[in-house]
Amino acid sequence: MKGLYQAAGRTLVTLGGLSIFSGAIAFFPVFSCKLWYTGWSVWIACPIWNGALAVTAGSLVLLAHREWTQRHLWEAVFTFVILSILGCPLHFTVALQSALLGPYCFYSFSGVAGTNYLGYVVTFPFPYTKFPSVCVDPLHYEEYHLTLQVLDLCLSLILFCVSLAVFIKLSARLMQTGYINGPENPQ
């Protein structure tokens, strides 16, 4: 049991950090520092908030494991793991929808006053292989977009599984003993 909580906590912190990073780099397409590419949408916000929940839950798991008898820490872990479980399907759905709709191309087809969002122009799902350079600026934005969405799909699935494992373990302990904090941690 000692290894499960440590592994789950470290996994939640690491993958939550990757999710926050994924949402943060989505602000700047293809690492462009042009301010007019900066955007804010649910595609960006969802990985950041879900990652923040996972990092918080993982940090609390690691802290609660060290201070085994602190009941308030285990209750906070339980709460944030539930929130993470609820956020992961939303994160997965947004990433899947975003991958199927295609990239939000800036200044495409007709210069500065371009079509902007190509999801209304091309077929559904987005034909990544048929139009290799639909987004004129920034270059390689289709590959960048698809890579970020696949990363978000994988992260949300793994975060869901790890959060669910911690939730099941804590629920089993709650049903067995009647309280959420376990016996003294031998160190």
UniProtKB/Swiss-Prot annotation:
Superkingdom of origin organism: Eukaryota
Alphabetic keyword roster: Membrane, Transmembrane, Transmembrane helix
Main location: membrane
Topology of the protein relative to the lipid bilayer: Multi-pass membrane protein
GO cellular component: membrane
TM segment ranges: 11-31, 42-62, 76-96, 106-126, 148-168
Disulfide bonds: none
Subcellular location: Membrane
Keyword Transmembrane helix tagged: yes
Signal peptide segment: none
Name of protein: Transmembrane protein 212
Gene that this polypeptide is encoded by: Tmem212
